[in-house]
């Protein structure tokens, strides 16, 4: 994975902080009139700027609050920012740590800064799960992810520049330096994983095809000793009975692929955890054609696959001591003379038949066979990730992923991982009352149901995930940004990575 900047913990810097030539210095300040030693040094070097701001009520040190102070000959930093770290004796929540991490990142990247130092005071945390190590992990993820630029298809003169190159962190902490460094490294690796997912998502559909995803997966496997990759073509999938997956790509000249990545970090014979991604590299809707406006964004319909490929690299980089399988079901959904038609009936790998009432509900079709495929690994748990329904955006907007599961313990573990990683999800019901909406007169199951589109889509998938604890993440609203910021977000790589870290 590509490292976009050098991010390090350097406690020795506290001695020469003001003499170190840098572009930006970020100083954490707790609420109250008493400054910690570093903030006191900065205050004296800037003729009492910090205390003056506090006295005038212009800076209250509220969690996440920021302020700019002018520099002078007393410091070697071009710019100095203050960030609020809250009351020193009040425990900081996970949300508080998120605010601090984002404020740090914003201050480092607001101007064309190349080098920076971040100084953080001693902080008390609300729970055992929140520590200084946790904060540094969040900062590592946020800074690395923010340093992302996409320029793969830009002319040289239009290449975007990532200015930030080197950031050092000094923190007043009771935790060991080893733990703090571990947190920072883990966060940065997760941020790198997010950027891998962004790169794949942002490529145009004429470049990022199912074959391209297969090549990318093989390339990733070649970089890590414990990671392997196998790619199945259409002939092999046909032999395995994956007619449901294959039906989606019938109208396309691009060959559909099933990609199976295997990370062996645990003991031989230990059952793996599995993650499964929807990889529709371009989704026109097929015969059930989508309207033209925003159809260009349908290149993002492979973000589930991108998150799987990226997460497999994260766990390989972190050398987690568990076994993990990552599966990508990839196809291009196009209209054509051979395309699947509304009303067609296909047989799945499981033997169940599906009436395809809407060819634009194709993600669940490729996932159905992929979920059956992972049975062979006897997984401890399976999490599938898909930009599956527009309905989840109506329900949860663009900030929160939808989560449905056949196992309450697994659901809670994923929700907790999302809270830790600042990549949150919300659980929706998967009750039997919704299952009847998928009844068909002509097959075992229809591929669309009633008004609760996100839930009925998950109900469809649940029919193919009956042999293991399973959860579904609908990331249609969170995997990419809209408008001026259009592009892949890298989510839910942090959630998936944190879940697997917690399992290791």
What are the residue ranges of the model-derived segments?
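A generic structural signal for tightly packed, nonpolar segments enriched in small/aliphatic residues
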Residues: 58, 115, 197, 213-504
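Short amphipathic alpha-helical segment within the helicase RecA-like ATPase core
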Residues: 1-279
């Amino acid at each position: 994975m590509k490292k976009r900047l050098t991010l390090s913990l350097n406690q020795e810097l506290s001695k020469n902080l003001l003499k170190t030539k840098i572009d930006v210095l970020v100083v954490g300040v707790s609420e109250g009139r008493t400054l910690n030693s570093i903030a006191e040094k900065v205050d004296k070097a800037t003729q009492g700027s910090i205390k003056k701001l506090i006295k005038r009520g212009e800076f209250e040190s509220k969690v996440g609050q920021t302020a700019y102070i002018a520099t002078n000959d007393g410091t070697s930093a071009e710019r100095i920012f203050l960030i609020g770290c809250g009351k020193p004796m009040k425990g900081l929540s996970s949300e508080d740590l998120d605010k601090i991490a984002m404020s740090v990142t914003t201050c480092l990247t607001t101007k064309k800064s190349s080098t920076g130092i971040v100084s953080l005071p001693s902080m008390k945390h609300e729970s055992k799960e929140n520590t200084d190590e946790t904060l540094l992990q969040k900062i590592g993820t946020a800074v690395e992810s923010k340093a992302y630029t996409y320029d793969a298809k830009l002319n040289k003169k239009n290449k975007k520049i990532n200015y930030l190159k080197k950031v050092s962190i000094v923190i007043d902490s009771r935790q060991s330096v080893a733990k703090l460094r571990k947190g920072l490294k883990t966060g940065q690796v997760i941020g790198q994983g997010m950027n891998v997912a962004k790169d794949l998502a942002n490529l145009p559909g004429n470049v990022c095809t199912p074959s391209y995803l297969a090549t990318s997966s093989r390339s990733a496997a070649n970089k890590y000793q414990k990671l392997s990759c196998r790619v199945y073509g259409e002939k092999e999938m046909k032999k395995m009975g994956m007619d449901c997956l294959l039906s989606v790509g019938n109208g396309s000249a691009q060959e559909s692929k099933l990609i199976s990545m295997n990370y062996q970090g645990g003991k031989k014979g230990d059952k793996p955890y599995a993650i499964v991604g929807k990889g529709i590299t371009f989704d026109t809707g097929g015969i059930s054609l989508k309207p033209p406006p925003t159809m260009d964004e349908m290149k993002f319909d492979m973000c589930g696959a991108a998150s799987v490929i990226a997460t497999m690299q994260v766990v390989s980089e972190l050398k987690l001591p568990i076994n993990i399988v990552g599966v990508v079901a990839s196809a291009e959904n196009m209209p054509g003379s051979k395309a699947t038609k509304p009303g067609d009936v296909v047989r799945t790998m499981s033997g169940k038949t599906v009436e395809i009432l809407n060819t634009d509900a194709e993600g669940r079709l490729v996932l159905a066979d992929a979920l059956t495929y992972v049975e062979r690994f006897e997984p401890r748990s399976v999490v599938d990730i898909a930009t599956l329904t527009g309905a989840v955006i109506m329900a949860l907007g663009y900030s929160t992923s939808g989560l449905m599961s056949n196992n309450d313990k697994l659901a809670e573990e994923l929700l907790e991982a999302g809270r830790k990683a600042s990549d949150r999800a919300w659980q929706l019901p998967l009750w039997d009352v919704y299952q009847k909406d998928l009844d068909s007169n002509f097959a075992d199951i229809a591929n669309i149901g009633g008004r609760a589109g996100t839930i009925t889509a998950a109900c469809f998938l649940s029919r193919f995930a009956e042999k293991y604890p399973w959860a579904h993440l609908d990331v249609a609203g969170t995997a990419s940004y809209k408008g001026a910021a259009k592009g892949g977000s890298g989510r839910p790589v942090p959630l998936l990575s944190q879940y697997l870290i917690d399992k290791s």
